Amino acid sequence: MLPETSLRGRLLAATVVLGLSATGAFAQQEPCIGNSVAVTGPAAFSGLAIKLGAEIAIDEINAAGGVLGKKLKLIQYDDAGAPPRGVDNTRRIALADKCIAVLGGFHSTVALAQVDPIHEIGIPYMGVWAANTKAIENGRDPNFMFRISAKDKWVARFLVDEALKVSKNGKIAFFYENTGWGNGALPDVKSALAAKGKELVAAETFNWNDQDMTPQVIRARDAGADVAIFWAIDREGNQILRSMDKAGWKPTIIGAWGISGNLGELAGPLANGVRVMQTYSFQTEQSATGKKVLAAIEAKTGIKDPRDIKAASGIADAYDAVYLLADAIKIAGAYDWKKVQAALYQVSRDGLVAPYKPAFDKKDPERQDALLPQYYLLTVWHEGKLIPFKGSPYDK
């Protein structure tokens, strides 16, 4: 029988070893990226686009040998646009799958709900679509939430600039959904207009699944607005267009990218001329990387005409997001959440959408966003297709 002191020593040593092993296991994550996006519901097009872009990047990375000698894989979850599901997915990706990072999807309400669990756990998050300003500029230090997508603060300035270019009387109306995304955009739009010495003549909100926007439309029309900015998804964007048609009001419409999915199908000819902010289009002159991604899209989906690609921005942003994460893992030298979070500030590369040099800046809270506003572009709905505005029938 061992002496008590010897037994106690061995138990203590075992405890230390187990503790060290647990720490090492916790630090060393798996070579997977968890994709928590909407692949069902009205924004399913967005999640499918993000999945496609991420898969193309992962295929390329793995064909070149993977990252730190390991092949990456994508683990897919559906948040269906529901914040509780997004939170649950985050915990599963981090604690059950032990992935190195989370990709975030379309809905800002989900991204806002993920802020707490992301930071409680300490897993890097890369937003690929949801544009709410405060989801990423969240005041956390260290901040584990990054984005390669649009940011509403910058989108508001972009859309306000476009609105004032085309307005004949400087009167702008704003239609926004009653969600974290829409409500978060209202102060951004007001601020962008105030910087130009203007203010909204109408700010009209609505809920998901509202069928008739006639009261809101009439108030905006009677306020004299000749341009309407939309912060809506396709479903409600369609209802606003139909209410405008019923009211006999035809303002110029400029929207955030929530109406970039199937508005042309839902609204038919009423969508013609509706302008939409995007971060990428496969219909412009393509770089070598763009041509390579187009070929991969055709191989995976059978789509040959770039005009038939839905949610091009989601595909392109997700593609670049995976490469930024892969670069950070290489710089970190390990599949370790904290090391990868720190390494993201050192990443610099020429991406599909834009050059990221550097991708992020730790000293500037605004630069948790990799994609700068000079790379935003304007597209327009025409005969059921979303095409570049420049050179379109509406570019007069």
Regions found by a protein language model. Name each.
Residues 2-4, 12-15, 26-396:
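Extracytosolic ligand-binding ectodomains
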